[in-house]
UniProtKB/Swiss-Prot annotation:
Known pathway: Lipid metabolism; peroxisomal fatty acid beta-oxidation
PANTHER family on file: 3-KETOACYL-COA THIOLASE B, PEROXISOMAL, 3-KETOACYL-COA THIOLASE, PEROXISOMAL
Name listed for the protein in its UniProt record: 3-ketoacyl-CoA thiolase B, peroxisomal
Modified residues (N6-acetyllysine): K173, K234
EC number annotated for this UniProt entry: 2.3.1.155, 2.3.1.16, 2.3.1.9
Site (Increases nucleophilicity of active site Cys): H377
Region (PTS2-type peroxisomal targeting signal): 1-26
Gene name of this polypeptide: Acaa1b
Binding site for CoA: R249, T252, S276
Entry's Gene Ontology cellular component terms: mitochondrion; peroxisomal matrix
Length: 424
């Protein structure tokens, strides 16, 4: 029941994607560099904590956000006043975290002259923040901006849909927007034949990949250690420094996963083990116009090549990436075969398996360091976290390559973005 209330914003009709100018690949298969490119300069994230019982259960979201804002600026030695705008993805904090995010800005030493907004597109909020900042750069509003995502699922009011018209009872799609996310996962599994065995196998792979990545130090470059305090049952405070994700379970086995009962529906196949974790965390991504980055001597970690959002039926919202990814690839002039890494959010194994199979993506290209089933899914943070993880992994590999970030979105949508790593 707890998961039924807290697993939000995830998950066959054919959605239409908007038309866009096609980018033309160069003869080597990569897009031509341009002074007007929107580039990713740098990105950092906090460790991801388990909501309500983990390392950040007593840490406010403004502190999590401040930690990554401060780290990104310090890492590249950028003066805070040089930021043209800040966009913060958030889902569950009051007012989409508008006040909380502005407080975090000031806690990070960023002056009041730098504007800030928050955005809530549910589980794609962090990626939408990236798109919003990129849009401001493209339209000439500024040359440098910060895109962030943050969520404290511990310190949030869940299960409150607010004031909604009674007319939703007359409209099937409107009613479907209130279907619990776990039930949408069951709908995907039943409608598209995703077995419990496949879901558990996908979940096991996520845990194994994350455990391997953690043991090899693959997350060190992206994680900002956070010093905070936790309270025990007696109210005593203890200061701790958190430097790695809490949700990774190296001892996970198929046998253990098979013992878990369905979390949302009698006879169902979605369990706590093959669903994303309820989590706390934050991430920040610094973007700039290529010409400005070069002028200031800033590094270029990646290039944003395209972004797309599509709509899908709300009752199977988890299929969103299966339609958003082709739309983003089309805008970039690329195909599935051109992509080295797909960071697809693991809201539920059911929908992730469906999307991977629908698009024919080789398993080795999907979430090579694990995903939300193992790492956790702080709703507003996830999209920004995925960008940071993707580009750091491409950097580790060292060669020029493309990667995709994608996720499903509660109420029936999917989002995807294509990034290029320029090579060492």
């Amino acid at each position: 029941m707890h998961r039924l209330q807290v697993v939000l914003g995830h998950l066959a009709g054919r959605p239409e994607s908007s038309s866009a100018l096609q980018a033309a690949p160069c003869s080597a298969g990569f897009l031509q560099a341009s002074a007007s490119d929107v580039v990713v300069v740098h990105g950092r994230r906090t460790p991801i904590g388990r909501a309500s019982r983990g390392c950040f259960k007593d840490t406010t979201p403004d502190e999590l956000l401040s930690a990554v804002l401060t780290a990104v600026l310090q890492d590249v030695k950028l003066k805070p006043e040089q930021l043209g705008d800040i966009s913060v993805g958030n889902v569950l904090q009051p007012g989409a975290g508008a006040i909380m995010a502005r407080i975090a800005q000031f806690l990070s030493g960023i002056p009041e002259t730098v504007p800030l907004s928050t955005v809530n597109r549910q589980c794609s909020s962090g990626l939408q923040a990236v798109a919003n900042i990129a849009g401001g750069i493209r339209n000439g509003s500024y040359d440098i901006g910060m895109a962030c995502g943050v969520e404290s699922m511990t310190l949030s009011q869940r299960g409150n849909h607010g004031n909604i018209s009674s007319r939703l009872l007359e409209n099937e799609k409107a009613r479907d927007c209130l279907i619990p996310m776990g039930i949408t996962s069951e709908n995907v599994a039943e409608r598209f034949g995703v077995s419990r065995q496949k879901q558990d196998a996908f979940a096991l792979a996520s845990q194994q990949k994350a455990a391997s990545a953690q043991s090899r130090g693959c997350f060190h470059a992206e994680i900002v250690p956070v010093t905070t305090t936790v309270l025990n049952d007696k109210g005593d405070k203890k200061t701790i420094t958190v430097s790695q994700d809490e949700g990774v379970r190296p001892s996970t086995t198929m046998q253990g996963l098979a013992k878990l009962k369905p979390a949302f529906k009698d006879g169902g196949s979605t369990t706590a083990g093959n669903s994303s974790q309820v989590s706390d965390g934050a991430a920040a991504v610094l973007l700039a116009r290529r010409s400005k980055a070069e002028e200031l001597g800033l590094p270029i970690l990646g290039v944003l090549r395209s972004y797309a959002v599509v709509g899908v039926p709300p009752d199977v919202m988890g299929i969103g990436p299966a339609y958003a990814i082709p739309a983003a690839l089309q805008k970039a002039g690329l195909t599935v075969n051109d992509i080295d890494i797909f960071e697809i959010n693991e809201a539920f194994a059911s929908q992730a398996v469906y999307c991977v199979e629908k698009l024919g993506i080789p398993a080795e290209k999907v979430n090579p360091l694990g995903g939300a089933i193992a790492l956790g899914h702080p709703l507003g943070c996830t999209g920004a976290r995925q960008v940071v993880t993707l580009l750091n992994e491409l950097k580790r590999r060292g060669r020029r390559a493309y990667g995709v970030v994608s996720m499903c979105i509660g109420t029936g949508m999917g989002a995807a973005a294509v990034f290029e790593y320029p090579g060492n």
